[in-house]
């Protein structure tokens, strides 16, 4: 037997030994996966049972509170606070357990498990989401500038509007996945992206004509301003979140948002004038479009729908920001009154 053939045979035996070890390791891996699935099922059912009992207990406490003495009322209040705290713990637990997707994710992805099991994977996905927002904000800013000052063609406007639709659709999907993994983004700042997706889609279908041309430059100027404000928000919010996480005051899955939240009060109040300016520009867009919808040359249904959508965006953004600012001022006023 030649030396080369002997060497091949020796390598094969070495590979055979490694393969046997690999098979054993893979067997253990599958066994651990089955154990993990069993533990996940056990935890999920236990949490559901606990939540049901806590819900019943909360209703009972509410009935008891009506006829309780002062001492009993304090006990009821303490127990209610403990229940609220326990519910927050369950929320954190469920972030590491498989769960049914919401309606939106089911429609887009189907019944696929999107739960990330490690903190490292969750944070990596959140970080990638933030980078996606930053890069697309810069691209949209450049696109809006190009369409406003250089490319005066309907086809380039359609490309820009299609990019907006794709951007907001992608944001809603990624945010839904992050919410499934324990991110606490909620309320209007989630709905805001669904409304923006709809608005961008209607803009995409608006045919070229005199009415479109009357609104085109105003919309592109608004898009430029909005992208600049979003870039500022991302840049400063990210630094603020990093500092608050280091102090243990924020969750590691908290996200930057296109608005104002209570945690931004320290260090980011300088953004408020820009935000309110953007909100009132949305109102200005709505008023302009309502006027254009009554123009004698207007035949497109998109004009009135866009006007109504811009009005919804203004009301949602303005009232939510105002609510946060008012609540924070009330809280600060309460602190100053305390001896």
From Swiss-Prot:
Record-linked InterPro entries: TMEM120A/B
Nucleus recorded as keyword: yes
Record membrane topology: Multi-pass membrane protein
Membrane-spanning ranges: 102-124, 132-152, 159-179, 187-207, 270-290, 302-322
Family as reported in the entry's similarity comment: Belongs to the TMEM120 family.
Identification of the protein by name: Transmembrane protein 120B
Subunit structure: Heterooligomer with TMEM120A.
Organism per entry: Homo sapiens (Human)
GO BP terms: fat cell differentiation; protein heterooligomerization
Coiled coil regions in record: 1-77
Subcellular location: Nucleus inner membrane
């Amino acid at each position: 037997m030649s030396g080369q053939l002997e060497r091949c045979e020796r390598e094969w035996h070495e590979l055979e030994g490694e393969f046997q070890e690999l098979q054993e390791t893979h067997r253990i891996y599958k066994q651990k996966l089955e154990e993990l699935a069993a533990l996940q099922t056990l935890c999920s059912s236990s949490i559901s049972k606990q939540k049901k009992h806590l819900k019943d207990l909360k209703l009972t406490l509410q009935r008891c509170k009506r006829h309780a003495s002062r001492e009993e009322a304090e006990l009821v209040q303490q127990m209610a606070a403990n229940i609220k705290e326990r519910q927050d713990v369950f929320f954190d637990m469920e972030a590491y357990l498989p769960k049914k997707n919401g309606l939106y994710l089911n429609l887009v992805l189907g019944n696929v498990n999107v739960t990330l099991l490690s903190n490292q994977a969750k944070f990596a996905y959140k970080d990638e989401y933030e980078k996606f927002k930053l890069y697309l904000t810069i691209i949209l800013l450049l696109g809006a500038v190009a369409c406003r000052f250089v490319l005066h063609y309907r086809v380039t406007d359609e490309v820009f509007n299609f990019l907006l639709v794709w951007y907001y659709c992608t944001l809603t999907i990624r945010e839904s996945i992050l919410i499934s993994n324990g991110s606490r983004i909620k309320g209007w700042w989630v709905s805001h992206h669904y409304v923006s997706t709809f608005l961008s889609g209607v803009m995409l279908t608006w045919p070229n004509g005199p009415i479109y041309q009357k609104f085109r430059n105003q919309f592109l100027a608004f898009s430029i301003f909005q992208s600049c404000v979003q870039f500022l928000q991302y840049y400063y919010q990210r630094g603020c979140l990093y500092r608050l996480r280091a102090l243990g005051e924020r969750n590691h899955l908290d996200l930057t948002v296109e608005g104002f939240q209570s945690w931004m009060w320290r260090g980011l109040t300088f953004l408020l004038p820009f935000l309110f300016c953007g909100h009132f520009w949305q109102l200005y867009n709505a008023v302009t479009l309502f006027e254009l919808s009554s123009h004698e040359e207007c035949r497109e249904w998109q004009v009135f729908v866009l006007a109504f959508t811009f009005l919804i965006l203004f009301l949602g953004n303005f009232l939510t920001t105002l609510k946060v600012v008012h609540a924070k001022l009330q809280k600060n006023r309460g602190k100053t009154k305390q001896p």
